[in-house]
Amino acid sequence: MTINRPSAMNSLPSASHWEAEALLSWYDNEPSLRVLIITGAGKKAFCAGQDLIEQAEFRTGTKEVDMAARRHPPSGFAGISRRMGKGKPIIAAVNGFALGGGFEICLNW
């Protein structure tokens, strides 16, 4: 699984948390898969956490948002931070900065 936003230091916009949750749920239920590796595109950052530019747009009203979609899924940041005990390993291949929620991903796997 590659976080592919190198121009934004692989920060995650709100919708991506739910997309990652869906992908990881599929991974958990796919018997042929034994391990998942998560990494960031580019060489500068693994993940800079939440997309703060998007957050500022929400606060100033320049971007509309569904408040329910803005919340993290029950499994936490990027669908990972509260996903303990699922049984299948997730490896964080950290290639650069891991800031905020990006560091949270690393701590949990």
Q: Which residues fall in each region the model found?
A:
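Short, active-site-adjacent cap segments at secondary-structure transitions
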Residues: K43-C47, L99
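Conserved CoA-thioester-binding segment of acyl-CoA-metabolizing enzymes
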Residues: M1-K44, A56-F58
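An acidic, glycine-rich surface segment that forms the CoA-thioester-binding/catalytic face
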Residues: H17-E21, S25, L52-N95
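Short glycine/serine-rich donor-binding loops of glycosyltransferases
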Residues: G102-F103
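Acidic-histidine catalytic/liganding microenvironments
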Residues: E30, G49, G87
